[in-house]
Amino acid sequence: MALPFSLLMALVVLSCHSSCSLGCDLPHTHSLGNTRVLMLLGQMRRISPFSCLKDRNDFGFPQEVFDGNQFRKPQAISAVHETIQQIFHLFSTDGSSAAWDESLLDKLYTGLYQQLTELEACLSQEVGVEETPLMNEDSLLAVRRYFQRITLYLQEKKYSPCAWEIVRAEIMRSFSSSTNLPQS
């Protein structure tokens, strides 16, 4: 009984540390939140990806939007914020709730919501420091088109279990690609 309590206390301390020390120390808090979300996405796997190889698709993840040296910190944070909003929306659809374990889905929503809250707090600090356009229109459109392609794919595949597995794996890949934010 002591081990689960110790583990719970460690998680509470980590959670408090990540949300209480948000003096826009985003790379650390963002990394912790990403780890939690990625673990949940991994736990959501219901079928073997190898049984879905025929359903693979290149959704055209806009990696250039997340290249740290192209944008300053507020723009990069804004791009990640848009991505997390789109992921939240994707997993909030009716088709999604039928495809996944409800408990894991609720935990995913909570993790994504926490990420959005931290990013919004950091964005408001960053924008107060420098007046920079948050995200240029081309980058915003690239992220939205990427998620539109994913949504169309799911519709074409009639939200099949394999289609959701391909999308889950794609979201894990793209989510982990968006974790490196510029320090300055």
From Swiss-Prot:
One GO cellular component, as annotated: extracellular space
SMART domains listed in its UniProt record: IFabd
Chief location bin: secreted
The entry's keywords: Antiviral defense, Cytokine, Disulfide bond, Secreted, Signal
Alphabetized GO MF terms: cytokine activity; type I interferon receptor binding
Keyword Membrane among UniProt keywords: no
Signal peptide range in chain numbering: 1-23
CDD domains per record: IFab (cd00095)
Disulphide-bonded residues: 24-122, 52-162
InterPro entries: 4_helix_cytokine-like_core, Interferon_alpha/beta/delta
Pfam families xref list: Interferon (PF00143)
GO biological process entries: adaptive immune response; B cell activation involved in immune response; defense response to virus; humoral immune response; natural killer cell activation involved in immune response; response to exogenous dsRNA; T cell activation involved in immune response; type I interferon-mediated signaling pathway
Record's subcellular location: Secreted
SUPFAM superfamilies, A to Z: 4-helical cytokines
Gene3D superfamilies according to UniProt: 1.20.1250.10
Domain of life: Eukaryota
Function: Produced by macrophages, IFN-alpha have antiviral activities. Interferon stimulates the production of two enzymes: a protein kinase and an oligoadenylate synthetase.
Family note: Belongs to the alpha/beta interferon family.
Name of the protein: Interferon alpha-4
Provenance organism: Equus caballus (Horse)
